[in-house]
Amino acid sequence: VKIHIELVTGFLGAGKTSFINSILSESIVEGERILVLQLEHGKKEIKLANNNNSFIVHKLYDIDELKEKLISLIRQYNPNRIIVEYNGTIKFNTILDVLNEKVYKECCKITTVFFVADGITLKQFIDNLGSFIVPFIQNANMIVVNNTDYCRKELLDQNINKIRNINPRAYILKVNNKYSVKSTLKEAKVLDNGYLKKLRIKVVNHFKTY
């Protein structure tokens, strides 16, 4: 069974780390081991809320270090799931090309791409950095628009329309502010965290021991 990789993308300050803290809290199940790889160094830290070593945070300097260390990190921690956090200074295709190399595809698969954006600056980024930012939006399964409390309705509508024009298939999660990410995710019921996942993790871990 391949390790699931989730990519959390977005520009510095968009709220990626807060989002990761929320998905860790809302989606981890008993027996699941998660490796979080941070390819950026923002102010906010991943919160290790439990004490049973169910997830590990490892900071990487750049994409070259990811290529160099990913396999050894997988062997060291034997995760069920990997979350990669990186900002918009790395082209989307760059990290995609790395993770699609044969050595990684044999043991891993990208299952979900999240794009996290600040609703206040999203339109400006799309208008000014369109060719750079569009691939992130195009390939996202879920797009998180943060800080909607601080957006005029007109601006929020423009943001949603621009996203829909670029990626009509993605699930758009509108978050009022950084304090409500977790509750908004919980209410949306879009994360894999139920009985079937618990059973799947238990079976996978059982066979890994043999």
Where are these predicted regions, by residue range?
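Classical N-terminal secretory signal peptides
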Residues: V1, M142, H206-Y210
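Nucleotide-state-sensitive switch-loop elements of NTP-binding domains
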Residues: K2-T9, A14, S18-T112, K123
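Short beta-strand/turn micro-motifs composed of small residues
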Residues: T9, Q38-E40, A117, V145-N147, ...
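Short, surface-exposed, polar/charged, turn-prone segments marking secondary-structure boundaries
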Residues: I34-V36, D62-K67, K109-V113, I137, ...
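Short, charged/polar "capping" segments at the starts of alpha-helices
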Residues: G42-L48, L122-K123, C151-L156, S180-K182
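Short, hinge-like loop/turn segments at secondary-structure boundaries
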Residues: N52-S54, F132-I133, K189-D192
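Phosphate/Mg2+-binding loops and adjacent switch elements
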Residues: Y86-K162, I166-N167
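C-terminal accessory "lid"/substrate-recognition subdomains
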Residues: R152-Y210
